[in-house]
Amino acid sequence: KVRGIYLGSKLENVEVMDSIKDTYNILAKAIKEHRKVLIDYYSYKKGITTRTINPYDLFLYSSGWGVAAYCNLRHDLRHFELKRIDKIKLLDEFF
């Protein structure tokens, strides 16, 4: 259940838990600049996988913040929970 959606113009007014603040800020910048991001993502079923994603939107739902993104590994749109992103790197590639 989505409780909020990222709006680039209101980024400064968003409160984010300290544990995911860096991840949130990198994703917000990537969304604004249409840049790809490299993440290590933890899945309960598959453990950690490394993925390149094209992030489109940040959203708040019942269990926390998420990002809607195109996953280059799965070739599909996916939702990723920010609390499950272990490592993140902003790339110099655009989408």
What are the language-model segments listed below?
Residues 1-95:
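Short glycine- and basic-residue-enriched patches
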